[in-house]
């Protein structure tokens, strides 16, 4: 685990974005942890968040031409990532995002920001069912652009209805790389270093045994 990944886990815990307990997911599963990126909700939070996304993206080595933030959660994430890439890595990358409702006045259209073209890095918080990715792909393909990859905060490394995770299904269906700041394996590694979090480690490890994908 790299330093920025450890720092991100601590940041998420500090802001209560990452919590431990018993949480019922949309799938009906009872998860021992929950990640809610919507709680990164101040200017300082977003500035720090962008630095972690930028670090993971640079670390990935994937080539891309533009950041795309799907409405709504992806919009501030793509924006702060673009700023962090410029300020901390001297990489000036265009970005754009979509509107849920198309405008018929002013500049019109369903996209805001740079022209959607070339190799697109889609930026979001997490992938659960992959539905948002598939919706975004319709927009990307409609503009004759290509999906270079998907950048998210957390990969739960968890099976969907079959043996694959939602992320693995996206990789299979669209042939793109998925970049996550942290994976469940990183979280377990972090917990194993903290004696006071032994109970959380046991619960998360048991959950992975039951629902985790094969490495």
Swiss-Prot record:
The gene is pyrE. Orotate binds at residues 34-35, 128, 156. InterPro entries: OPRT, Or_phspho_trans_dom, PRibTrfase_dom, PRTase-like. It comes from Shewanella oneidensis (strain ATCC 700550 / JCM 31522 / CIP 106686 / LMG 19005 / NCIMB 14063 / MR-1). PANTHER family: OROTATE PHOSPHORIBOSYLTRANSFERASE 1-RELATED. The keyword Transferase applies. One of its GO terms (cellular component) is cytoplasm. The keyword Glycosyltransferase applies. GO terms for biological process: 'de novo' pyrimidine nucleobase biosynthetic process; 'de novo' UMP biosynthetic process; pyrimidine nucleotide biosynthetic process; pyrimidine ribonucleoside biosynthetic process. This is Orotate phosphoribosyltransferase.
């Amino acid at each position: 685990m790299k330093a920025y990944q450890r720092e991100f886990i601590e940041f998420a815990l500090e802001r209560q974005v990452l919590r431990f307990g018993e949480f019922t997911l949309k799938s009906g599963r009872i998860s021992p942890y929950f990640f809610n990126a919507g709680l990164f909700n101040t200017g300082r939070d977003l500035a720090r968040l962008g630095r972690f996304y930028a670090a993971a993206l640079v670390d990935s080595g994937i080539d891309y031409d533009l950041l795309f933030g799907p409405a709504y959660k992806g919009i501030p994430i793509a924006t702060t990532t673009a700023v962090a890439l410029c300020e901390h890595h001297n990489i000036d990358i265009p970005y754009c995002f979509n509107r849920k409702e198309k405008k018929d006045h002013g500049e019109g259209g369903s996209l805001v920001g740079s022209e959607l073209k070339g190799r697109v890095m889609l930026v979001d918080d997490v992938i659960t069912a992959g539905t948002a990715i598939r919706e975004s792909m319709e927009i990307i393909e409609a503009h004759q652009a290509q999906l270079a990859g998907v950048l998210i905060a957390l990969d739960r490394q968890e099976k969907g209805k079959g043996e694959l995770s939602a992320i693995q299904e996206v990789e299979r269906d669209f042939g793109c790389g998925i970049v996550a700041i942290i994976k469940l394996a990183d979280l377990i590694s972090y917990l194993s270093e903290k004696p006071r979090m032994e109970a959380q480690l046991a619960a998360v490890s048991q959950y992975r045994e039951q629902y985790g994908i094969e490495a």
